[in-house]
Amino acid sequence: PAEVMADMQELYSIFARNPLILRINTIIIVFKIHLISTRMEEQTMEKKDLDWGNIGFSYMPTDKRYVANYKDGAWDEGGMTSDPNVVINECAGILQYCQEIFEGLKAYTTEDGSIVTFRPDLNAERMMDSARRLEMPPFPKERFLEAVDQVVKANAAWVPPFGSGATLYLRPYMFATGPVIGVKPSQEYQFRLFGTPVGPYFKGGAKPLTLCVSDFDRAAPNGTGHVKAGLNYAMSLHASVTAHAAGYDENVFLDPGTRTYIEETGGANFLFVTKDGEVVTPKSDSILPSITRRSLVYVAEHYLGLKVTQRPVKLSELDEFAECGLCGTAAVISPVGRIVDHGREICFPSGMDAMGPVTKKLYDTLTGIQMGTIEAPEGWIRKIV
């Protein structure tokens, strides 16, 4: 800053005359630098002037993002950039053969004003698994966590305040940048991570959803349904648009082998509650291993003392459940009030007005852990600021 430079010039002019004054001025300047840096840090921590309660779930560019490149068998040092644009070769593997994976996690402002992330180590591990399945070089776990920390710190002003109902959604992704004209893995890749503030994933928030059983398949048997890759989500777009046009909030995808078992929706896992209060989650090799579902299972067992069963769930048994919800990073838990199966309506006793009692307890407990109002299991919360 200019005021510090002026002090430095004055200091040098008197240095030869009085070393004691030099020491005193040095102390004063160091103190000024500390005060100025503190003020600058406070300014960067000031939240953006946004209507946090009504921002919706959409992309909003923030200040900085992280970029690292893989070439000649190794990742470079990586670093932050303010440029949101990606420039790649016209024959890049991502453009020709959809070689891409991604993750989703959130940063939260807790009750005490800290900024934290929720179980980012699991996102790093899942992304490494996805990379191996698509023949891509895994981005190291520690570097993934460092990238998350850097992006959150650089965009701290974009992390919504506590109690706003909004969060900073973080999107790590990796794609093939090297030119590939034959069907084979690329030799070059780019890892990027950006953040964007978001509100609830579903417009109605906690209002129960109406779903329809889809005629389309999300994944193939022994395919990539368990991998968080863009190609899986591209496959669901037509089904999603068709469902929305018919007035439904989401699709219910069935197992592609027999079309008799519940899998998931286009962007979330299912969670059911029996009339006896038991939590049931569908089990299938083609379902994405949701970190939110895994966390809810732990919360149900260890915080709420509920019985939890993970097993295949038949479409024909849905009317035996008392509650139904969709869970994922974006949605957390969204209640489902009704599922329509080609004219047959399955209405859950929890109704169309609010979350069922067990679903509500699960939601309140998990979000309480994320926001710092409920003590978290060891290792679940990573404090960044």
Tell me what each language-model feature is.
Residues G163-R171, F175:
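Extended, Lys/Arg-enriched charged tracts that mediate electrostatic binding to polyanionic substrates
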Residues V4-M5, I27:
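Short, low-complexity, intrinsically disordered N-terminal modules
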Residues M40-V151, Y173, V180-V385:
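Helix-start/capping segments and mature chain N-termini
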Residues V4, I14-F15:
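Residue-level detector of alpha-helical hydrophobic segments embedded in or interacting with membranes
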Residues M5-M8, M40:
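Methionine residue identity
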Residues E142, V151-G165:
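Charged, gly/pro-rich active-site loop segments
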Residues Y12-I14, I21-E41:
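Short, positively charged and aromatic/hydrophobic N-terminal segments
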